[in-house]
UniProtKB/Swiss-Prot annotation:
Cofactors (names): FAD
Residues annotated as site: Important for enzyme activity: 91
Name of the featured protein: Squalene monooxygenase
Entry annotated with the keyword Flavoprotein: yes
Any Gene Ontology CC annotation: lipid droplet
UniProt-recorded Gene Ontology molecular function terms: flavin adenine dinucleotide binding; squalene monooxygenase activity
Membrane topology: Multi-pass membrane protein
Entry's transmembrane regions: 434-454, 467-487
Involved pathway(s): Terpene metabolism; lanosterol biosynthesis; lanosterol from farnesyl diphosphate: step 2/3
Lineage of source species: Eukaryota, Fungi, Dikarya, Ascomycota, Saccharomycotina
């Protein structure tokens, strides 16, 4: 079978003579949500994806409660159903073998997820029962829930929901370039379509959602490029015995980099091992054996060793990218193409989906042919999204700096953070709300972060001799300075970019 005939016909026959209301570039997590939402708002949408078959990736597998709430607002939450997904009810942190656990926030402490008109109907904002997901647990439990899943299965569900919309046309093809007119305004995309060659498709608005390795974020800014400071090595553990069921796990220690573990199906657990450099060690299996395996909790050791023996692993760079302002007529960049954070906290999908919710509320009811008015609203969108994006993004890099502590004072902060979280629910309520993505307050995040820093200073005085007490005073100033150094620049960048 030739390449030209190997794709379903319906993915190749988009009409280039039509001027679409919107072209969506990319059908990852964010793209289908944008396309579905706009179609339900009455827009004629073309969504272009290079490969519609199910991907095999280790990104986007743990969704925080804020992401689930956003899916409810979009009427797409049933994308987590029938994919052997696993609910998550909180986090467990293990520090040098000592364990603390905390649950996600109470629903009563939050406003209900917003039901966006035209998007939510016929109960599509409710989770349903399947083999691994309990509707009662999600809908009636007093606390919020997150969910872990195999990324590709979730993605195919999102794409299926998108494909069911009459106003959505799907196209298989490789977007070569973003089209502009003589005034440098974006007017569509040039797509290399199998069997048709290079075809120009026109639209009033073009939404770039092409993910981590975006080719087209440069259409907004050629200088705002992503930075990579560290990497994750991912392994699949089968029939693993997690220390706390239905929890995400962060495994910390004074002698090793962070390790993240969470269940993604009834039989599979993902484990991500941090490597504090952008390029991986030459011998990854040897590094895993020597630098990671000794610190794996006993209950996970058997499945981890089996994964090591298979020598099957995947690697991912941990990228950082502040958002550029959407200031080009006819163009909107959204998702990881716009903004990236460290994946340690699992907040990426939450930010992207909350951005889609805000985007639809901002421009969903507008006439996209009035492009300058849409652009004016997108300028407001840039600032309004900062509340949730700033918290999740800044928290991700600040926590990674603490959890991957590679200096004396960062280790002091790491120990203080763990002990702070262990003081009980009253102390952990706001931190877990930040981690869940449901407390979009940069002010409160700053307050809590420096409260943790001050607590680290306080416990550093314990058991000191008189001479040691004087040293602790000096170290206290150094701890606060270190905290400011790892937190303030990123907060500043997020708020003022």
């Amino acid at each position: 079978m030739s390449k030209e005939t190997s794709y379903p016909k319906e993915l190749l026959c988009a009409d280039e003579k039509v001027v679409y209301d919107a072209i969506v570039v990319g059908a990852g997590v964010v793209g289908p949500c944008v396309a579905t939402a706009l179609a339900r708002k009455g827009k004629k949408v073309l969504i272009v994806e290079r490969e519609w078959s199910q991907p095999d990736r280790i990104v986007g597998e743990l969704m925080q409660p804020a992401g689930v709430r956003a899916l409810r607002s979009l009427g797409m939450v049933q994308a987590i159903n029938n994919i052997d997904a696993c609910s998550t009810s909180g986090y467990t942190v293990i520090y040098n073998g000592e364990k603390i656990s905390f649950a996600y926030p109470y629903k009563a402490d939050l406003s209900p997820p917003e039901k966006i008109p035209d998007l939510v109907f016929d109960g599509n904002d409710k989770v349903v029962d399947d083999g691994t997901i309990s509707a009662k647990e999600f809908e009636e439990d007093e606390r919020e829930h997150g969910v872990g899943f195999v990324h590709g299965r979730f993605l195919q569900n999102l794409r299926a929901i998108c494909a069911a919309e009459d106003r959505v046309t799907r196209l298989q093809g490789n977007v070569i370039s973003i089209l502009r007119n003589d005034s440098k305004e974006v007017i569509g995309a040039k797509v290399d379509v199998p069997g048709r060659g290079k075809v120009d498709f026109k639209a009033h608005m073009t939404f770039v959602c092409d993910g981590i390795f975006s080719r087209f974020r440069k259409e907004l800014s050629t200088t705002n490029t992503s930075k990579v400071w560290s990497s994750f090595v991912g392994l699949s553990l089968h029939h693993a015995d997690l220390p706390t069921k239905h929890h995400g796990h962060v495994i910390l220690g004074s002698e090793h980099m962070p390790v993240i573990a969470y269940q993604i199906s009834s039989t599979e657990t993902r484990i991500l091992c941090a490597y504090n450099y952008p390029t991986l060690p030459k011998n990854v299996p040897e590094w895993l054996q020597k630098e990671v395996q000794p610190f794996i909790p006993p209950s996970l050791r058997k499945s981890f060793d089996a994964a090591l023996e298979s020598k099957s692993y995947k690697c991912m760079p941990n990228s950082w990218l502040p958002a550029s302002q959407n200031n080009v007529t006819g163009l909107c960049v959204v998702g990881d193409a716009l903004n990236m954070r460290h994946p340690l906290t699992g907040g990426g999908m939450a930010v992207g989906l909350m951005d889609v919710v805000l985007l639809v509320k901002t421009i969903g009811d507008m006439d996209f042919s009035d492009r300058e008015e849409v652009l004016n609203e997108l300028l407001g969108f840039h600032y309004e999204r900062k509340a949730h994006a700033c918290v999740i993004n800044t928290l991700s890099i600040a926590l990674y700096s603490l959890f991957a502590a590679d200096s004396y004072y960062l280790k002091k902060l790491q120990k203080g953070c763990f002990e702070y979280l262990g003081r009980g629910e009253d102390w952990v309520r706001q931190p877990i709300s930040f981690l869940s993505g449901v407390l979009p307050s940069p002010y409160l995040l700053t307050k809590v972060f420096f409260t943790v820093a001050l607590y680290s200073v306080l416990i550093n005085f314990r058991g000191r001799t008189p001479l040691g007490f004087l040293l602790a005073i000096y170290e206290g100033f150094a701890i606060i300075f270190t905290a400011a150094k790892v937190f303030t620049p990123f907060l500043y960048e997020q708020l003022l970019q």
